[in-house]
């Protein structure tokens, strides 16, 4: 995608008023609508940039190139192309899940663009290693991939409530909706890319101040990961823990998350 058409292809929107720019970047299985409960808290003081990852169900699947999006780097290219197309010089960046990973790499490539990284449900690696607890064994992940491939609908019905964690049926419905919007083959392909990614080796290259936001219990990211990030990220790093459970607090506990985001954003 060229800079010219990426804004249209990835449904880029800029909403709100204010001098400061805030990026809200969604995670796997959702699209920019995942921020709809968060947005009202920030549109009076920020110009908020929203976009859809190329894998999102809200994007024309023809844009998803299976030969290109084999690592996180092309997603980073997309983000930086959006930033450049909009003429943004500096912004605060909120990234959820895979978009937290994307933000990390983008900040290493172009640190001058980012005043603050706020990473929600972020893990540099989901698989366990000898001296690292990512939360998943390789065999467990392969079973997940097999379930997605065998019966995507059944997998979504099982995974959505597990990921949301908190007892918020509306959040489960919303997450299920956006998961179902994804083409199953794209969903599986992206899952493999994310679970095969390992950013541990580059964390020390991050120089942008970072706030890691986790929930009290997240099926995708063990609590120990936040402490790992605190000690391995290269920039000033703080860790905040929400008094809620689940991987999608923007859907299940938006008021609480918005409060934490306000506190974390540069003054």
Curated annotation (Swiss-Prot):
Q: Which Pfam families did the record assign? A: Abhydrolase_6
Which keywords are on file for this protein? Cytoplasm, Hydrolase, Nucleus
Q: Which SUPFAM superfamilies match?
A: alpha/beta-Hydrolases (SSF53474)
Q: Any idea of its EC number?
A: 3.1.-.-
Q: Extract the coiled-coil ranges from the record.
A: none
Active site residues of this protein: 97, 218, 247
Which tissues express it? Expressed at high levels in rosette and cauline leaves and at lower levels in axillary buds, inflorescences, stems, roots and developing vascular tissue of cotyledons.
Q: From the Swiss-Prot or TrEMBL record, give the protein name.
A: Strigolactone esterase D14
Q: Which gene encodes it?
A: D14
């Amino acid at each position: 995608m060229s800079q010219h058409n990426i804004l249209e292809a990835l449904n880029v929107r800029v909403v709100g008023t204010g001098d400061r720019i805030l990026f809200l970047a969604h995670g796997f299985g959702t699209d920019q609508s995942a921020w709809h409960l968060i947005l009202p808290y920030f549109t009076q003081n920020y110009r908020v940039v929203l976009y859809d990852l190329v894998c999102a169900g809200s994007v024309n699947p023809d844009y998803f190139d299976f030969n290109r999006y084999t690592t996180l780097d092309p997603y980073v290219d997309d983000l930086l192309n959006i930033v450049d197309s909009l003429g943004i010089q500096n912004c605060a960046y909120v990234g959820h899940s895979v978009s937290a990973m994307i933000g990390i790499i983008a900040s290493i490539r172009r640190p001058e663009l980012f005043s603050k990284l706020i990473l929600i449900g972020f893990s540099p690696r989901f698989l366990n290693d000898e001296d690292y607890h990512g939360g998943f064994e390789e065999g467990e992940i392969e079973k997940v991939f097999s379930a997605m491939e065998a019966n995507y609908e059944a997998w979504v019905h099982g995974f959505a409530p597990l990921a949301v964690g908190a007892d918020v049926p509306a959040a489960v419905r919303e997450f299920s909706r956006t998961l179902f919007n994804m083409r199953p083959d794209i969903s599986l392909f992206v899952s493999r890319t994310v679970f095969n990614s390992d950013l541990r080796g580059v964390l020390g290259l991050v120089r942008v101040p970072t706030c890691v936001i986790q929930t009290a219990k997240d099926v995708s990211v063990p609590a120990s990961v936040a402490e790992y990030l605190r000690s391995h990220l290269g920039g000033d790093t703080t860790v905040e823990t929400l008094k809620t459970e689940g991987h999608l607090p923007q859907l299940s506990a938006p008021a609480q998350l918005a409060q934490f985001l306000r506190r974390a954003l540069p003054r």
